[in-house]
């Protein structure tokens, strides 16, 4: 089946978060994103979302650099000739170094279109079989421990299957101790976002007593070696996030013993195809995976749901309900959580309708790119 993309629309959106979200890197009150729409010659649309942030705190990519890469390099490559399978794009994009979030946004839109043309849900096109997925929730650093406990209480009452608490050197052991005292049985993990160094090994080891599911990305994003030195010192499994940008990164991390769990983020690794390859590798190695979040709007959230239906996604992910972040999302129906589960949509493609009225409301500017007559 050949997919002939007639044109691509890039939209720059800005959405206000319902509440500020704080990590060891800073506080977010709004999310800028690029929404990618690809339209074939029959007028069928596929949707993707760039998860890059406005500033390069998570990686070197930003919304502005993603727009530049999409406009000047990636969109022309996608429009150059028909596409028979979305994974062909990774070969077309191979000459472009890094810029994984930009690549993933465009590839994701093509995956959505591909699944719609097949008449199957995106989850099925990827090889997933789950009807429901377990989800957890990520909670940013709060003004006080009392505030944090109130937030956790609210999400536990809503049935979330796992609680993730952001930590940093001034907000870690004592905070987790109090959380565990109040919630002794809640599946709990800590996310450091690279806030520590190997010098802090004893401090990180102090977290062992709290029975955490994992500690996520304690050390620098580019340091697999020190993570390999740290893991044997801890009872708590290390989960790598920012360190894993590709299949090869995952392979090296597992070979070195840098982690026991991997967080797969579609944007960080360059698309659904690479995410699936990493999933398959981890399944072979006996390393569980889960799907992390990047404050996605509805389109990105739908892609996360689809990839999480693969068999080795055995730990609850960060794909919380739309209402956790937004007053109004850009999809209908919005993503809802019931009893800690999200029902996987069974409609073709991402399974949700894009709410064009809301998209228009959030759009700051847009640009259309047409296929040339020779393409």
Swiss-Prot record:
Reactions this protein catalyses: (1R,6R)-6-hydroxy-2-succinyl-cyclohexa-2,4-diene-1-carboxylate = 2-succinylbenzoate + H2O; N-acetyl-D-methionine = N-acetyl-L-methionine
InterPro entries, alphabetized: Enolase-like_C_sf, Enolase-like_N, Enolase_C-like, Mandelate_racemase_C, Mandelate_racemase_N_dom, MenC, OSBS/NAAAR
GO biological process, alphabetically ordered: menaquinone biosynthetic process
Cofactor note: Shows highest activity in vitro with Co(2+) and Ni(2+).
GO molecular function, one term: magnesium ion binding
Temperature effects on activity: Optimum temperature is 55-65 degrees Celsius.
Effect of residue 191 to A: Almost loss of activity with N-formyl-D/L-methionine
Pfam families: MR_MLE_C, MR_MLE_N
Keyword Isomerase: yes
pH dependence of function: Optimum pH is 8.0-8.5.
Keyword terms: Isomerase, Lyase, Magnesium, Menaquinone biosynthesis, Metal-binding
Cofactor: a divalent metal cation
Residues engaged in binding Mg(2+): 191, 216, 241
Keyword Nucleotide-binding set for record: no
Active site: 166, 265
SUPFAM superfamilies documented for this protein: Enolase C-terminal domain-like (SSF51604), Enolase N-terminal domain-like (SSF54826)
Enzyme Commission numbers on file: 4.2.1.113, 5.1.1.-
Taxonomic superkingdom: Bacteria
Recorded metabolic or biological pathway in which this protein acts: Quinol/quinone metabolism; 1,4-dihydroxy-2-naphthoate biosynthesis; 1,4-dihydroxy-2-naphthoate from chorismate: step 4/7; Quinol/quinone metabolism; menaquinone biosynthesis
SUBUNIT field: Homotetramer.
PANTHER family cross-referenced by the UniProt entry: O-SUCCINYLBENZOATE SYNTHASE, O-SUCCINYLBENZOATE SYNTHASE-RELATED
Entry function: Converts 2-succinyl-6-hydroxy-2,4-cyclohexadiene-1-carboxylate (SHCHC) to 2-succinylbenzoate (OSB). Also acts as a N-succinylamino acid racemase (NSAR) that catalyzes the racemization of N-succinyl-D/L-phenylalanine. Can catalyze the racemization of a broad range of N-acylamino acids, including N-acetyl-D-methionine, N-formyl-D/L-methionine, N-formyl-D/L-norleucine, N-formyl-D/L-aminobutyric acid, N-formyl-D/L-norvaline, N-formyl-D/L-homophenylalanine, N-carbamoyl-D-methionine and N-carbamoyl-D-norleucine.
Assigned protein family: Belongs to the mandelate racemase/muconate lactonizing enzyme family. MenC type 2 subfamily.
Full protein name: o-succinylbenzoate synthase
Gene coding for it: menC
